[in-house]
Amino acid sequence: MSSGALFPSLVPGSRGSSSKYLVEFRAGKMSLKGSTVTPDKRKGLVYIQQTDDSLIHFCWKDRTSGSVEDDLIIFPDDCEFKRVSQCTTGRVYVLKFKAGSKRLFFWMQEPKTDKDEEYCRKLNEYLNNPPMPGALGGSGSGSHELSALGGEGGLQSLLGNMSHNQLMQLIGPTGLGGLGGLGALTGPGLASLLGSGGPTTSSSSSSSRSQSAAVTPSSTTSSTRTTSAPVAPAAAPATTPSPAVSSNDGASEATSPTQPIQLSDLQNILATMNVPATGEGGQQVDLASVLTPEIMAPILANAEVQERLTPYLPSGESLPQTADEIQNTLTSPQFQQALGMFSAALASGQLGPLMSQFGLPADAVDAANKGDIEAFAKAMQSTSSQKERESSEKKEEEEDMSLD
């Protein structure tokens, strides 16, 4: 399962990838079992690629078959690539994610060792400081796409094409207040457009712009990364609509969960967020360490659970929607990465307004406001149990009526 771009392109012909890799070197994969890593003997290639939507991809492909087995979208300050100093018998490197316990190991296959350190340095540089669109001498399609998004209409169309999970991924990766995730998508341009997409005559838009400009990635990213616990994107059932984020003049706007997320809503959320070091309450939980294959195995063995999860699997000719694919998806690096992103976002205590717009129950919204992951899970479980009881009672009533 490979990770695709976060957004569909709005500009015809702008989708695609750069003709050259930012950095590449020959390296094989390694599998981790317990505390031991075992090398995969296949010839491989590690490379960093910036696609035309400005996203940075960390990839590994089999050089013999040409198959790309790992394709991870990396945001600044997401991870670090470094040599494993404990291994003295080989040139082993690890891609370590800062949110959670996910690690990917590789062993160098370059015949000479003189450039190992340079490859490592360049890889970290491109992961954490992506080049601006067109900075590498390209055709400038990135800036062209940004100009096409100018104004509220273009951005509203962009938001309209996003699912709830994609919006969470947009906001969550590098800290909600830092706009790091936004900046990584299309450089500083998108963050700027979000602050100025509304009409210039609107006083609320002007206020939003000034607040957005005051929040910079450098001011919040590091503190969020080191203190937030990671979590997974979860699509929860909508129940009752709740008030949206308050506007800058103090008035509240009610947003129905069936309506698309408006640009002004996202502007207000991003403009007023100031991520605290930790959530207000509850013990921090790393969902990536909780939802392990060992714990999930007996749950996934349940046929009813399999039936409910199968429709949410990625679809495609090479991706059969089967019970085995459920297991493959949950153990994939992409799922673990998304799990970490959602965990960090939820633990920050800043997802309450977003949960309100999704129509989640009041208990879940309150837990999200506090950054209490455990309370959030219990609230969602309680809602699910209540719906199951209501469904069961309704079914019994229908059966009784049919007997009469």
UniProtKB/Swiss-Prot annotation:
Residues 195-258, 376-404 are annotated as: Disordered. Residues 278-390 form the DEUBAD domain. Keywords: Cytoplasm, Developmental protein, Nucleus, Proteasome. Its main location: cytoplasm. The keyword Magnesium does not apply. The keyword Transmembrane does not apply. It comes from the Eukaryota. InterPro entries: DEUBAD_dom, Rpn13/ADRM1, Rpn13/ADRM1_Pru, Rpn13/ADRM1_Pru_sf, RPN13_DEUBAD, RPN13_DEUBAD_sf. GO terms for molecular function: endopeptidase activator activity; proteasome binding. Residues 195-247 have a biased composition (Low complexity). Disulfide bonds: none annotated. It is found in: Cytoplasm; Nucleus. Residues 17-130 form the Pru domain. Residues 248-258 have a biased composition (Polar residues). Residues 386-395 have a biased composition (Basic and acidic residues). GO terms for cellular component: cytoplasm; nucleus; proteasome regulatory particle, lid subcomplex. Pfam families: Rpn13_ADRM1_Pru (PF04683), RPN13_C (PF16550). Belongs to the ADRM1 family. Component of the 19S proteasome regulatory particle complex. The 26S proteasome consists of a 20S core particle (CP) and two 19S regulatory subunits (RP). Component of the 26S proteasome, a multiprotein complex involved in the ATP-dependent degradation of ubiquitinated proteins. This complex plays a key role in the maintenance of protein homeostasis by removing misfolded or damaged proteins, which could impair cellular functions, and by removing proteins whose functions are no longer required. Therefore, the proteasome participates in numerous cellular processes, including cell cycle progression, apoptosis, or DNA damage repair. Within the complex, functions as a proteasomal ubiquitin receptor. This is Proteasomal ubiquitin receptor ADRM1-A.
